[in-house]
């Protein structure tokens, strides 16, 4: 009885919250993906797997596979991965640079990093159209990649910076005393200490980049369709909520598989940080 009371007092509120606002909505979306479209924005019986067949490219009318959705999904993973890679290349050294500054300058740099969040996201993305316009016909995919990197770079830098602040630099001195080069000492003594922030930063960057549709709509000019655009169109213009729900679950599955693979690649420590 005492154990039950402790559970209700500690994990109980969190469990109820996750059940009501995470598990239950996901179950509703999954049920929608199995229903039949009856009208614009309406679904009903009977249950069917047609929506899932369409997700994986099977055209029931012509009884053939048209892998358009899978191509869009692959493009989305590719662009999100590139944006995440750019955030790593730019954000990792930036986090070290900020941490190496004086207290006053460090606060200023962090403020400058956070200031964009004070402006509406749409306004910031539209501003990039004005910035890129003088360069003429800017490739749509490159513009989308640039917009994603700009939008999600702070999400990568902040958790990495939090890890860099806790780095024990005495381990670097010990590695150099044992004959390691500066690069080897950094890789062996510093990178493992920043791995928690690196894992968190990659996740916070890749997941929203994979599902975004605003950046590709505005900067891509509807020429670079990503999976987020497909989902948004089903719940908006097309009004096919059943098919949109199936696409949403496909996107969720890809994200979960990607996180699992990244955790495995990062090793046991990365898995613990992810949990």
Description of each model-found segment:
Residues 12-24, 115, 150-152, 156-169, ...:
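Transmembrane alpha-helices
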Residues 64-97:
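Transmembrane alpha-helix signature in integral membrane proteins
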Residues 25-65, 131, 217, 221-222, ...:
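Short membrane-interfacial helix/loop motifs at transmembrane-helix boundaries
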Residues 2, 9, 161-176, 188, ...:
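C-terminal transmembrane helix and the adjacent membrane-cytosol boundary/short C-terminal tail
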Residues 1-29, 107:
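N-terminal signal-anchor/first transmembrane alpha helix
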Residues 49, 122-149, 183, 219-223:
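Membrane-interfacial helix termini and adjacent extracytoplasmic/periplasmic loops
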């Amino acid at each position: 009885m005492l154990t039950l009371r402790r559970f209700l007092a500690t994990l109980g509120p969190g469990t109820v919250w996750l059940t009501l606002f995470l598990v239950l909505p996901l179950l509703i979306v999954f049920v929608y993906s199995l229903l039949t479209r009856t009208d614009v924005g309406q679904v009903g019986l009977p249950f069917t797997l047609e929506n899932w067949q369409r997700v994986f490219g099977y055209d029931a009318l012509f009884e053939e596979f048209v892998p358009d959705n899978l191509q869009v999904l692959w493009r989305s993973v590719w662009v999100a991965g590139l944006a995440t890679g750019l955030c790593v290349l730019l954000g990792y050294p930036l986090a070290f640079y900020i941490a190496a500054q004086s207290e006053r300058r460090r606060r200023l740099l962090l403020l400058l990093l956070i200031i964009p969040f004070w402006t509406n996201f749409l306004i910031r993305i539209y501003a990039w159209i004005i910035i890129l316009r003088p360069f003429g016909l800017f490739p749509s995919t490159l513009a989308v990649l640039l917009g994603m990197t700009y939008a999600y770079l702070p999400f990568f830098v902040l958790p990495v910076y939090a890890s860099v602040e806790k780095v024990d630099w005495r381990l670097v001195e010990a590695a150099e005393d044992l004959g390691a080069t500066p690069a080897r000492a950094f890789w062996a003594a510093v990178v493992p200490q920043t791995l928690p922030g690196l894992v968190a930063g990659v996740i916070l960057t890749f997941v929203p980049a994979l599902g975004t549709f605003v950046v590709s709509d505005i900067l891509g000019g509807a020429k670079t369709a990503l999976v987020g655009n497909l989902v948004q169109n089903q719940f908006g213009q097309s009004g096919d909520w059943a098919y949109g729900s199936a696409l949403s679950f496909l996107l969720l599955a890809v994200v979960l598989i990607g996180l699992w693979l990244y955790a495995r690649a990062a090793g046991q420590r990365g898995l613990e940080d992810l949990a």
